[in-house]
């Protein structure tokens, strides 16, 4: 779904999320894990923005910070123009929670094993005091049917279902309050490839039907390419590159993005140019002690002296194509 000329539903302005490192008998603070370190972008109503990167890059923490499961250390999070960065839990529940929901990576761990599907899915109705008991039960059955599960399953427990079915249950729960934005954190990474396709297709159908906006977090570049309108690439808590999916996959600018895309297996037409495989040296540095300057310079194959000293500005290097790299300064 295109996001051209549409309103901004979510905006991050230099958002940081640090976790304190404590040590010693009195648990004094000795440092910070910089999980998210100065991320800025906006999300348009009706679009799907994919966020990709290696494990430990901060993408899941960024998603949980956006929905205020974590309170940001610094920066602003604006939902439909309202700054929700410092709202109390009560105000979040009244003005934000209904409109932003999350689908988690592990479809089993995110469901209470002691509760039936009916209890799990209608819990948001209970929390927000919506509908009569009869209407709540009817809504549960409607939601189960909409995600491809038989309404008679409402009395069963999560352990009775497969991984793909459990993820459908998680999606049904996320839809209960008619949200405008759904943050999907690796929603298909724990599923078989054939089941992944079914869940992705379901999410696309639901987006069209309910006019949803998605923030889709994944390490799988192929899945992100299929579902996203724009794609952002994160590395060590920072946004490296952000642009439309076709532009990113056809013309990646940042050396890290180029390395990621070179690792994706592709089928080529006869006569097409083969993309050179770029192998990054070394391990991902610790977010507790990120490199000075550009955080990627320790693994970058084209690093310059300035990369070791100065943090590159995240700026527009081409129309609607943002990148944080000194090569485009």
Swiss-Prot record:
Q: In what residue span(s) does the ABC transporter domain sit?
A: 10-261
Organism this protein belongs to: Bacillus subtilis (strain 168)
Known Gene3D superfamilies for this protein? P-loop containing nucleotide triphosphate hydrolases
Q: Which CDD domains match?
A: ABC_NikE_OppD_transporters
- Tell me the domain of life: Bacteria
Q: Which PROSITE patterns match?
A: ABC_TRANSPORTER_1 (PS00211), ABC_TRANSPORTER_2 (PS50893)
Put simply, this protein is called Oligopeptide transport ATP-binding protein AppF
Task: List the keywords (alphabetical).
Answer: ATP-binding, Cell membrane, Competence, Membrane, Nucleotide-binding, Peptide transport, Protein transport, Sporulation, Transport
Question: What the protein does?
Answer: This protein is a component of an oligopeptide permease, a binding protein-dependent transport system. This APP system can completely substitute for the OPP system in both sporulation and genetic competence, though, unlike OPP, is incapable of transporting tripeptides. Probably responsible for energy coupling to the transport system.
NCBIfam families of this UniProt entry? oligo_HPY, PRK11308.1
Gene symbol of the encoding locus = appF
Regarding the membrane, this protein is recorded as: Peripheral membrane protein
Pfam families the UniProt entry points to = ABC_tran, oligo_HPY
Locations listed in the record: Cell membrane
């Amino acid at each position: 779904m295109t996001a051209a000329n549409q309103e901004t539903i979510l905006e991050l302005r230099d958002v940081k999320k640090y976790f304190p490192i404590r040590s010693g008998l009195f648990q004094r603070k000795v440092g910070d894990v910089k999980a998210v370190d100065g991320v800025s972008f906006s999300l348009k109503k009706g679009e799907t923005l994919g966020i990709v990167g290696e494990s430990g890059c901060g993408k899941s923490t960024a998603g949980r910070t956006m929905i205020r499961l974590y309170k940001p250390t610094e920066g602003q999070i604006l939902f439909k123009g309202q700054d929700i960065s410092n709202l109390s839990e009560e105000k979040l529940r009244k003005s934000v929670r209904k409109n932003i929901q999350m689908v988690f990576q592990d479809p089993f761990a995110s469901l209470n094993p002691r509760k039936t599907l009916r209890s799990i899915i209608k819990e948001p109705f209970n929390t927000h005091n919506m509908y009569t008991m009869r209407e709540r039960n009817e809504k549960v059955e409607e939601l189960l049917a909409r995600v491809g599960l038989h309404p008679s399953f409402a009395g069963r427990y999560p352990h009775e279902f497969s991984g793909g079915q459990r993820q459908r249950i998680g999606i049904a729960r996320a839809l209960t309050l008619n949200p405008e934005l759904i943050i999907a954190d690796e929603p298909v990474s724990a599923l078989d490839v054939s089941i992944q396709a079914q869940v992705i297709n379901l999410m696309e159908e639901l987006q069209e039907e309910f006019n949803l906006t998605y923030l889709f977090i994944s390490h799988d570049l192929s899945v992100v390419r299929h579902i996203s309108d724009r794609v952002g690439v994160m590395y060590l808590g920072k946004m490296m590159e952000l642009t439309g999916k076709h532009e990113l996959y056809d013309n990646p600018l940042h050396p890290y993005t180029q390395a990621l895309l070179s690792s994706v297996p592709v089928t080529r037409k006869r006569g097409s140019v083969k993309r050179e495989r770029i192998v990054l040296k070394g391990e991902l540095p610790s977010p507790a002690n990120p490199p000075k300057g550009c955080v990627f310079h320790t693994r970058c194959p084209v690093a310059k002296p300035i990369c070791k000293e100065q943090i590159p500005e995240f700026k527009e290097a081409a129309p609607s194509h943002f990148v944080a790299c000194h090569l485009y300064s």
